[in-house]
């Protein structure tokens, strides 16, 4: 009987060790995969890129098209239902497009990061930039939100989610805002080293090689 119990414990331990890392892509249409076939969105492309690196991960799509930082803060508890170890926070683009007060955007993101911190989750904050037609005062205040919050919360920052893609017609859909499949590939390729570094930090904390 004792031997059977030991075997069950070993099997349970092995199953737990084999469970894929849970990564939550918490954002707006840029993470939701707006306008793209399911296989071409940010989430499946990131999961595929991680698999190519030999990393077993389940990337969970918590992107809601049109969402603002206020909407993200309101639905955060629900989005964490799968208990992710790593959360990629990609919100703020719609705040900028609507010209919302950067102080409000910063406060909402601060609330999101504080809750994730309190739950001991690894965080990768993806930065966003305001549309350049909103004026220097607005864009300066908005663009500073992400590095300021990353420093305050001591979390990893990917400076600009659309780095290498924004304003390039070859990498965007007809609306000029949302990346096409090729654009998403660029986004994932640029962000991947940051995701890998975050995963390495999780493994070190857990005592894994």
Per-range role (PLM):
Residues 14-17, 119:
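Compositionally biased regions
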Residues 2-13:
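Bacterial N-terminal signal peptides
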Residues 16-65, 75-83:
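Serine-esterase "nucleophile elbow" of acetyl-processing enzymes
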Residues 4, 26, 30, 96, ...:
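General secondary-structure edge motif
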Residues 45, 52-55, 71-209:
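Alpha-helical cap/lid subdomain in secreted, periplasmic
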